[in-house]
Amino acid sequence: MNRTFLILLMVISAMLIAVLGQKNPTVQHKYTPWDISRTESGLLKAFGITLGETTIKESEISLGKTPEIELLSFNTDSSIDQRYELVAIYKDLIISGVISELRLTYQLEQRMLQALYSSLPTKSPAKESYNISPEVAAAHSSAAIASITYVPSINYGEEIIIQRFGTPEKAEVISDVVKKWLYPVMGLEIQLHANQSERFIYTN
């Protein structure tokens, strides 16, 4: 009786996994954060994305997932200096077996981002991020990607980072818990946090 019950339970579990897998397919990506190259024209390529060339729409196809879109507002003392970024956020990606997040910045002029900010129904000086509707985001899906931020769910640690990327050209101590390592030739900045996941920022 117990054996029959266990077999039935295993069959039901397998069916549930199959159904969930169809609704939320998990795509395995073989990219690694140290797999960085340059095109003949000097554009940086990482995670299958060529900065300044690959579009947001193309990244959605290659990553096999629909991102969340956020408009980030960087407040300063002067509204003239206020800056904005439109970011596509891909959560729960599986990259080389590691649950990860990719944040792709749209390559858009500040005047366009300012217009997008002005069109928001509600705004607050204290708020730093705003969710953007799929309809509004679709209007900018042909924009190229300006930068990539890779946030793994694990910390690689300084030793592995040096093994993979080499010694940083410049190291800065931001605070007691944050360090910044710079690899300008690679177009890479690594932020090492004592209490959070590392951040790998790729720019041209």
Regions found by a protein language model. Name each.
Residues 3-23:
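Hydrophobic membrane-insertion alpha-helices, especially the h-region
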Residues 5, 30-31, 35-39:
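Extended non-catalytic domains of envelope/secretory-pathway proteins
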Residues 22-31, 55-204:
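A cross-family detector of function-defining hotspots
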Residues 36, 48-51, 71, 150:
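Generic structural "secondary-structure junction" signal
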Residues 36-47, 137-146:
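Acidic/histidine-rich, surface-exposed loop or edge segments in extracytoplasmic proteins
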Residues 43, 47-60:
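Core segments of small alpha/beta cavity-forming domains
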